[in-house]
């Protein structure tokens, strides 16, 4: 994705020479000040991408194979897995091509590399946007299933879910193309940051409201069975811990990347901001880590999906 620092890694590798970079060390910024730079080895980056790729391929395969999983909720989960798959795959492709160019194993004209870089940028950006959208869609789906349980199947139908999925994909590709074309405009970067904050607020509000409703329900049961008061307290703590982990992982994995975009707008030349820009590859690695964690949170907790996945793996042998 075209941002400062590592945004033109493919194009820059045509004239670059490999240098030994420490995994964790101090690097000098433009003013000569020392700042902390965390380098992500290419091998680790590719390994994370491969793990994410395998996980999300398994999720998509299991949902496609089992007709019992062809419901709106699993439709959103499948599309989230597909988005995460594209995020990991596009970053792996860029890293692999870069390594081949740097090693001299792949010869290409600058114009060809530029076009390839643009295509990868669009895929990466659109898959990031769609991933955030599907995380929000899953939160909305769960909210409706709790607060409108009796009307859920009339509100969230499969045709509506498919239309929502199509709209998300089309909008993601369209806006990512515009973002890549006009990435050097501050308004474009601010739009991306505002979109991330909107998804964060949406998920936080919905999940907190769902937790409050669940605690109220557990409290009502505890009143009928006074002996279960301690169990109710434990449920509240467990729910709060789950919510903290869910939102915490989302913020920790996505937040640094959008902080990077924010600082490009606010302080592109400031020494402190320049230090943060040096860790762009780390921020991408965190997003890939989120793509690894998403199936664990949203997919593999389903007993039906795990059973189907087991059948798929056994059949493959």
From Swiss-Prot:
<feature type="topological domain" description="Cytoplasmic">
    <location>
        <begin position="301"/>
        <end position="317"/>
    </location>
</feature>
<feature type="transmembrane region" description="Helical; Name=2">
    <location>
        <begin position="73"/>
        <end position="93"/>
    </location>
</feature>
<keyword id="KW-0564">Palmitate</keyword>
<dbReference type="InterPro" id="IPR000761">
    <property type="entry name" value="MSH_rcpt"/>
</dbReference>
<feature type="transmembrane region" description="Helical; Name=3">
    <location>
        <begin position="119"/>
        <end position="140"/>
    </location>
</feature>
<keyword id="KW-0675">Receptor</keyword>
<keyword id="KW-0449">Lipoprotein</keyword>
<keyword id="KW-1133">Transmembrane helix</keyword>
<feature type="topological domain" description="Cytoplasmic">
    <location>
        <begin position="64"/>
        <end position="72"/>
    </location>
</feature>
<dbReference type="Pfam" id="PF00001">
    <property type="entry name" value="7tm_1"/>
</dbReference>
<feature type="topological domain" description="Cytoplasmic">
    <location>
        <begin position="141"/>
        <end position="163"/>
    </location>
</feature>
<dbReference type="InterPro" id="IPR017452">
    <property type="entry name" value="GPCR_Rhodpsn_7TM"/>
</dbReference>
<comment type="subunit">
    <text>Interacts with MGRN1, but does not undergo MGRN1-mediated ubiquitination; this interaction competes with GNAS-binding and thus inhibits agonist-induced cAMP production. Interacts with OPN3; the interaction results in a decrease in MC1R-mediated cAMP signaling and ultimately a decrease in melanin production in melanocytes.</text>
</comment>
<keyword id="KW-1003">Cell membrane</keyword>
<feature type="transmembrane region" description="Helical; Name=5">
    <location>
        <begin position="192"/>
        <end position="211"/>
    </location>
</feature>
<keyword id="KW-0325">Glycoprotein</keyword>
<keyword id="KW-0297">G-protein coupled receptor</keyword>
<feature type="transmembrane region" description="Helical; Name=4">
    <location>
        <begin position="164"/>
        <end position="183"/>
    </location>
</feature>
<dbReference type="GO" id="GO:0004980">
    <property type="term" value="F:melanocyte-stimulating hormone receptor activity"/>
</dbReference>
<dbReference type="InterPro" id="IPR000276">
    <property type="entry name" value="GPCR_Rhodpsn"/>
</dbReference>
<dbReference type="GO" id="GO:0007189">
    <property type="term" value="P:adenylate cyclase-activating G protein-coupled receptor signaling pathway"/>
</dbReference>
<feature type="lipid moiety-binding region" description="S-palmitoyl cysteine">
    <location>
        <position position="315"/>
    </location>
</feature>
<dbReference type="GO" id="GO:0005886">
    <property type="term" value="C:plasma membrane"/>
</dbReference>
<feature type="topological domain" description="Cytoplasmic">
    <location>
        <begin position="212"/>
        <end position="240"/>
    </location>
</feature>
<feature type="glycosylation site" description="N-linked (GlcNAc...) asparagine">
    <location>
        <position position="29"/>
    </location>
</feature>
<feature type="topological domain" description="Extracellular">
    <location>
        <begin position="184"/>
        <end position="191"/>
    </location>
</feature>
<feature type="transmembrane region" description="Helical; Name=7">
    <location>
        <begin position="280"/>
        <end position="300"/>
    </location>
</feature>
<comment type="function">
    <text>Receptor for MSH (alpha, beta and gamma) and ACTH. The activity of this receptor is mediated by G proteins which activate adenylate cyclase. Mediates melanogenesis, the production of eumelanin (black/brown) and phaeomelanin (red/yellow), via regulation of cAMP signaling in melanocytes.</text>
</comment>
<comment type="similarity">
    <text>Belongs to the G-protein coupled receptor 1 family.</text>
</comment>
<feature type="transmembrane region" description="Helical; Name=1">
    <location>
        <begin position="38"/>
        <end position="63"/>
    </location>
</feature>
<protein>
    <recommendedName>
        <fullName>Melanocyte-stimulating hormone receptor</fullName>
    </recommendedName>
</protein>
<feature type="topological domain" description="Extracellular">
    <location>
        <begin position="1"/>
        <end position="37"/>
    </location>
</feature>
<keyword id="KW-0472">Membrane</keyword>
<keyword id="KW-0807">Transducer</keyword>
<feature type="topological domain" description="Extracellular">
    <location>
        <begin position="94"/>
        <end position="118"/>
    </location>
</feature>
<dbReference type="InterPro" id="IPR001671">
    <property type="entry name" value="Melcrt_ACTH_rcpt"/>
</dbReference>
<keyword id="KW-0812">Transmembrane</keyword>
<feature type="topological domain" description="Extracellular">
    <location>
        <begin position="267"/>
        <end position="279"/>
    </location>
</feature>
<feature type="transmembrane region" description="Helical; Name=6">
    <location>
        <begin position="241"/>
        <end position="266"/>
    </location>
</feature>
């Amino acid at each position: 994705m075209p941002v400062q620092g590592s945004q033109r890694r493919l194009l820059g590798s045509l004239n670059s020479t490999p240098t030994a970079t420490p995994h964790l060390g101090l690097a000098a910024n433009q003013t000569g000040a020392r700042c902390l730079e965390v380098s992500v080895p290419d091998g680790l980056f590719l390994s994370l991408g491969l793990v994410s790729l395998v996980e999300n391929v398994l999720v998509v395969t299991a949902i496609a194979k089992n007709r019992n999983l062809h419901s709106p909720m699993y439709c959103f989960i499948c599309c989230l897995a597909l988005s995460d798959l594209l995020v990991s795959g596009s970053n792996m492709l860029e890293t692999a091509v870069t390594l081949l160019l740097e090693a001299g194993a792949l010869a290409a004209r600058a114009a060809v590399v530029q076009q390839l870089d643009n295509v990868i940028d669009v895929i990466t950006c659109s898959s990031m946007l769609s991933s955030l959208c599907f995380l929000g869609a899953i939160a909305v789906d769960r909210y409706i299933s709790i607060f409108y349980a009796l009307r859920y199947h009339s509100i969230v139908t499969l045709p509506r879910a498919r239309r929502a999925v199509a709209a998300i994909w089309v909008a993601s590709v369209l806006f990512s193309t515009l973002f890549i074309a006009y990435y050097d405009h501050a308004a474009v970067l601010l739009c991306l940051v505002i979109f991330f904050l909107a998804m964060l607020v949406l998920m936080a509000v919905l999940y907190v409201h769902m937790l409050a409703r669940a605690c109220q329900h557990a409290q009502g049961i505890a009143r009928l069975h006074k002996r279960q008061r301690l169990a109710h307290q434990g449920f509240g703590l467990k729910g709060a811990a789950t919510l903290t982990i869910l939102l915490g992982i989302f913020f920790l994995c996505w937040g640094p990347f959008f902080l990077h975009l924010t600082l490009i707008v606010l302080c592109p030349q400031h020494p402190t901001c320049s230090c943060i820009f040096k860790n762009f590859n780390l921020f991408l690695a965190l997003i890939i880590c989120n793509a690894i964690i998403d199936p664990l949170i949203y997919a593999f907790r389903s007993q039906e999906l795990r059973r189907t996945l087991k059948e798929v793996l056994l059949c493959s042998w």
